[in-house]
Each structure stands twice: as C-alpha cells, then as structure tokens.
C-alpha cells in the first residue's frame, strides 16, 4: 500500500514537471541543460583525478574551467562565423545570379532562380530577427544554466536529506527510486560524453583533411552540440556548410554534407547503439521516437527532456507497475 502511494506521488511529480515544461519552456530547458552540464563536469573531473591526486579540489576546478571555456569558445565563435560566411554566401549568390543574366536561359528558369535567391535572403533575415528577439531570454537561460551547474551537488544533498517530504509514506522506497533514476541518467550523460568526443574528432579532422577553415572550431562545436540529441548535427551543420561553400563552392557543400552525414551515421548506427542503448538498456529506436514525440510537443526543450523522461518512465514502470 505504501509503495502504491509512492507511485501516485511519483506520477504527480512527473505530470507537474511536464506542465511546467509546457508553461515555462525556457526555464525548464535551462535547468535540464544545467543538470547535463553538471554531470559532464563531474565526469571530466573524475577523469582528471586519475592523473591529479592532490589537491583534491584541483581536478574539479580544472574540469569547470575546461568545460566552460569549451562552451564559451564555441558560442563566441559561432555567430561571427555565421555572419561573416553569410555575407560571402550572399555575395556568391549575387555573382552567380549576375552571371546567369548574361546567359540566354529560359524565363521560367530565371524566375525560379530569382525566387530561390529572394526566399533565401528573406529566410536568413527572418532568422536573424528571431535570434535577436530571443536574446534576453537566452541571457536569462544562460545565467540559470551556470547557476544550476554549480548547485546541483547541493540540490542532490538537499533532496536526499528531505526525501521524506517528497515520499512521506515510504521515504526509503522513494529514495531508491530517485537514486536509480538519477544514476541511470548520469550514466547516459557519461556515455554521451564519449559519443560527443568521437563526433567532434571526426568532424574536426574531416574539416582539416578537406582544408575547410576553422577546423578546430567546427570540431569543438560538433562536440558541444552533440549533447542536443539529433538536433546538434543541424546546429553544427550551418557553419560547416557555409565555410565549405566559401572555400570550395558547390563541391564544398557536397564535402561538408558527406562529413556531416558520415558523423551522424557513425553516431546513430555504431556509437549510440553500443554506448547509449546499452547504458539505458532501451532500444535506440525507442529513444529516437521519444525524442521526436516530446520535441513535437515541447519544441527544443522536449528534445532535452526526452531522455530524463524516458528514464523516469522506465523506472516508474519497473518499480511501481511491475513491482520491481
């Protein structure tokens, strides 16, 4: 009976979380990203502890510096690269369009090319305006992400000490449920660190081999954005394709696309099934479907909460429906 009541409490917290995610997507997404970031810092610190024994706090400090510098480097370089390369792309499009005007081509084809060029320009301008409009929200979210990343360990300790308020009928059972769920999520993020390293190295070396500028930045960006399931490749694709096009023209678009597709397929068919699916003991296709469903329901935030939601749901079913 006590476990049954805990089941209701757990379900209530899940519903409350989803409602808040729908009503306040920026805040909840920022909190989840802060949680991701905290776990990443923990894993990097554990790795550094193998080589740095004393002082004990040093690996944690270095881990914080490395992770935040990586994110800052990617973020600071992202928009300047986009703006600079967009100008080159527009110039190239104008040059091609001017060249086509001197060629005797059918009127309908000329009209189509002009429409494509105009649509591309309008779409780019609209995207820039949307990004500018979201800047205040992005700043708030960034501050919240950093704060969350630093206080997660304190929050874990606080929840552990006050779990009897969350599950008053059977605190030990509730504590076991929360611990199992968080540990599995922690293992998943740890696995994602390995996947992201492989993807970042693949993209960075691919760009270097094909002489695409800013190969180091592209590799770092691919590493950072890989923590956004399935959408990260889209984010890293924008500067990669722009840089490839500005240097190699249309053949550069083909080269950039091949690098991105190869990295995506490597992750989807080799790395994710071996590392992530085995970590969660859930088939990768179920993970993909869950990401797509919650992404459709909660937009970008849904992509990030999909994995915590799936882990919570799996443990809820195992512990409270099937009886452990």
Swiss-Prot record:
Coiled coil: none annotated. Pfam families: AI-2E_transport. Its main location: membrane. GO terms for biological process: transmembrane transport. The chain crosses the membrane at residues 12-32, 62-82, 105-125, 131-151, 190-210, 227-247, 252-272, 285-305. It is found in: Cell membrane. One of its GO terms (cellular component) is plasma membrane. Keywords: Cell membrane, Membrane, Transmembrane, Transmembrane helix, Transport. The keyword Transmembrane helix applies. It is a multi-pass membrane protein. Belongs to the autoinducer-2 exporter (AI-2E) (TC 2.A.86) family. This is Putative transport protein TM_1187. It comes from Thermotoga maritima (strain ATCC 43589 / DSM 3109 / JCM 10099 / NBRC 100826 / MSB8).
């Amino acid at each position: 009976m006590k476990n049954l009541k805990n089941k209701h409490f757990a379900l209530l917290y899940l519903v409350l979380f989803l409602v808040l995610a729908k009503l306040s997507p920026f805040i909840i997404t920022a909190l989840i990203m802060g949680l991701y970031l905290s776990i990443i810092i923990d894993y990097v610190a554990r790795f550094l502890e193998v080589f740095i024994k004393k002082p004990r706090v040093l690996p944690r400090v270095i881990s914080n510096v490395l992770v935040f510098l990586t994110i800052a480097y990617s973020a600071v370089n992202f928009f300047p690269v986009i703006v600079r390369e967009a100008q080159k792309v527009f110039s190239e499009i104008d040059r091609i369009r001017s060249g086509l005007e001197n060629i005797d081509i059918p009127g309908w084809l000329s009209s189509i090319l002009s429409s494509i060029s105009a649509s591309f320009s309008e779409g780019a301008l609209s995207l820039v305006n949307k990004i500018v409009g979201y800047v205040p929200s992005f700043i708030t979210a960034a501050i919240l992400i950093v704060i969350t990343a630093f206080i997660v360990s304190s929050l874990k300790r606080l929840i552990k000490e006050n779990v009897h308020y969350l599950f008053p009928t059977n605190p030990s059972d509730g504590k076991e449920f929360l611990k199992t769920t968080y540990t599995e999520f922690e293992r998943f993020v740890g696995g994602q660190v390995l996947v992201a390293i492989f993807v970042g190295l693949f993209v960075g070396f691919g760009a270097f081999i094909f002489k695409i500028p800013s190969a180091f930045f592209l590799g770092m960006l691919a590493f950072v954005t890989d923590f956004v399931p399935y959408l990260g490749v889209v984010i890293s694709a924008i500067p990669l394709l722009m840089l490839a096009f500005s240097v190699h023209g249309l053949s550069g678009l083909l080269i950039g696309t091949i690098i991105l597709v190869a990295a995506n397929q490597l992750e989807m068919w080799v790395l994710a099934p071996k590392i992530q699916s085995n970590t969660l003991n859930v088939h990768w296709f179920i993970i993909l479907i869950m990401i797509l469903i919650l992404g459709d329901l909660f937009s970008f935030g849904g992509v990030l909460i999909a994995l915590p939601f799936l882990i919570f749901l799996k443990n809820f079913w195992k512990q409270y429906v099937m009886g452990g």
